[in-house]
């Protein structure tokens, strides 16, 4: 609660020194410390309800769709037949909501280490919680890395919806994790993981893409605009055992497109077009 001063929440972190994003608070809805992290939910004046983990904004009702749609539909529309999907993290439910929009998906497993995040979403993020009770969804509360050690060659698409590489999410940005991801993929499978902002963490992104290129035949980086995240954008690393993920390879039907607020085929392709400073550094 020390992040709220004089009616304003400010996101201050050593992971983006010298930067801060603030929202005016209308009402604190929930605050709790779990075994893994501190989580806070508040109603803001301009961004709706806001979920905060360890002082860092994870989702706001105003702009969450820009992240959830892109991290989900880029890999799913890049795969010819995504039947089995795994989501690591994603306890707010947003990625689940997007995955089950795909008729081809037969099953989706959510692996979340902290059940408190799921409960907070169920109680305070009504537009994000809708996927939890879908018949195609299975919830697993526990360590994602341990879960994948028991799964080999099983998933067509794996999405890592993690927080930043500090605290409980640190291991999700390391080589050993991407080795587990690769082993859990079916032939032609695709990994898509949250991969920070090129404006603030280009060296982190470079390190990740460098070792991923040693593991996967195709490694690419995309990004989306989202005002409530540091730097106003967030990126995704796409690691494919098949072809490129830079354009959708299946039809985006009018029925599916009508459910989107951000994603479409042109945005999919444009998200891989990097400004020169990032393209030069990442050399993808």
UniProtKB/Swiss-Prot annotation:
Domain PABS: 6-241
Catalytic residues in the record: 161
Enzyme Commission identifier(s): 2.5.1.16
Cross-referenced InterPro entries: PABS, PABS_CS, SAM-dependent_MTases_sf, Spermi_synthase, Spermi_synthase_euk, Spermidine_synt_N, Spermidine_synt_N_sf
Annotated putrescine binding sites: 67, 161-164, 229
Catalysed reaction, written as an equation: S-adenosyl 3-(methylsulfanyl)propylamine + putrescine = S-methyl-5'-thioadenosine + spermidine + H(+)
Residue numbers binding S-adenosyl 3-(methylsulfanyl)propylamine: 37, 68, 92, 112, 143-144, 161
Gene Ontology biological process terms, A to Z: sorocarp stalk morphogenesis; spermidine biosynthetic process
Keywords associated with the record: Polyamine biosynthesis, Spermidine biosynthesis, Transferase
GO cellular component: cytosol
Job of this protein: Catalyzes the production of spermidine from putrescine and decarboxylated S-adenosylmethionine (dcSAM). Has a strong preference for putrescine as substrate.
Name of the protein in question: Spermidine synthase
């Amino acid at each position: 609660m020390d992040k709220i001063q004089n009616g304003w929440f400010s996101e201050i972190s050593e992971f983006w020194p010298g930067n801060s994003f603030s929202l005016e608070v209308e009402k604190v809805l929930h605050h709790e410390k779990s075994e893994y992290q501190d989580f806070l939910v508040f109603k803001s004046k301009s961004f709706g309800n806001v979920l905060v983990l360890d002082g860092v904004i994870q989702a706001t009702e105003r702009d969450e769709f820009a992240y959830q749609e892109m991290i989900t539909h880029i890999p799913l529309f890049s795969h010819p037949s995504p039947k089995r999907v795994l989501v690591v993290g994603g306890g707010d439910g947003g990625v689940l909501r997007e995955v089950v929009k795909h008729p081809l998906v037969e099953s989706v497993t959510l692996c979340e280490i902290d059940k408190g995040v799921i409960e907070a979403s169920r109680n305070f993020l009504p537009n994000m919680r809708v996927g939890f009770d879908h018949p195609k969804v299975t919830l697993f509360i526990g360590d994602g890395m341990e879960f994948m050690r028991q799964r080999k060659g099983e998933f067509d698409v794996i999405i890592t919806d993690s927080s930043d590489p500090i605290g409980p999410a640190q291991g999700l940005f390391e080589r050993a994790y991407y080795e587990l991801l690769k082993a859990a993929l079916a032939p032609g499978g695709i990994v898509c993981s949250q991969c920070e902002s090129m404006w603030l963490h280009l060296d982190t992104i470079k390190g990740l893409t460098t070792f991923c290129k040693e593991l996967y035949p195709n490694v690419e980086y995309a990004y989306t605009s989202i005002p409530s995240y540091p730097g106003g954008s967030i990126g995704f690393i796409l690691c494919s055992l098949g072809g490129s993920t830079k354009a959708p390879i299946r039809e985006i039907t009018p029925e599916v497109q009508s459910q989107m607020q951000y994603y479409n085929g042109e945005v999919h392709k444009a998200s891989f077009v990097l400004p020169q400073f990032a393209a030069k550094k990442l050399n993808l």
